[in-house]
Structure formats: C-alpha cells, structure tokens
Amino acid sequence: MAAGSAALIFSCASASAIESNYKASSTSSADTVWSKVGGFCGIANWHPAVAKCELSHGNKIRTLSLKGGGTIVERLLRWNNKGKNYTYMILSSPLPVTSYVSTIKVVAKGTGSEVGWTGKYKAKKGTSDADAKKVIDGIYKAGVDVLAQ
C-alpha cells in the first residue's frame, strides 16, 4: 500500500511538481556516511533543524519536533539498507508544501561517497513555487552538508 501511495502522489503531482535535489561529496566511505544517516529516526542526530524524533506505527511513522517550534509527521515508504537509501512522504507539517515525497541516498564515489536528498512536491496554496523550493532546498542543504562532513 505504501508504494501505491507514493505512485499515486507522483502521478497526481507530476504535471506541476516542483523538484529539489542537493548532493555533496564526502571523503568518508558510503558505509560510514550511511551509518550517520542511522535509522528512520536518525535524522534527529544529524539535521540541525530537528530537536527530537519519535517513531510509531511499527516504526513506519516518524514525528519530528523542530528546534524552532513545530512538528512534521512523515511516513516511511521504502527502506533499502543495502542500496543505502530510503523514501518517505510528509503527512503533516508547517512547511509550505503538499504532496511531498523524498529520498535520501548515499552512493560510493571512488574512495569516498556522495550523499543526496531529492524530492518532489507542490507549493501550498498562497505560496509561490519559488518560495516553496527555497525552503526545501535550504532543508536539504543543511542536512546533506552535515552528513557529508
């Protein structure tokens, strides 16, 4: 059902979807960077905007408490430990986006690695595409830069 949910969101959002993509290189191995990612709630250990993460519903739902206030609730759609990536969707958040589906991925590059965060979403009513993209791009950059260190 989760994969079907992601497919439905992508098919509904594809005509006007906004895309964000941020990558950074690391001198650390892909295994080392992936270990920094941690589990689905590992984001609280590396993203500077996340104060706390709590798992529920069989570890498929995470609730992020943000350092500046606010809460984001996300559903894990796919976890691929061997492929060093996971995909999730936002269920509720104060962010200016809807229909949000995203993937965090780590790949080996020579003796180092590359960590990337990509997403597709729509701007909430009353928010320009450019403003929504600026917010998501900033979130991705802040997180990826920490993981790549």
Question: What is the meaning of each model-derived region?
Answer:
Residues 10-56:
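Hydrophobic ligand-binding cavity/cleft-lining segments
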Residues 20-22, 49, 60, 72, ...:
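Residue-level marker for the onset of beta-strands and adjacent loop->beta junctions
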Residues 28, 57-59, 83, 110:
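Residue-level signal for tight coil/turn positions that link beta-strands
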Residues 94, 114-116, 120-149:
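A conserved amphipathic terminal alpha-helix motif
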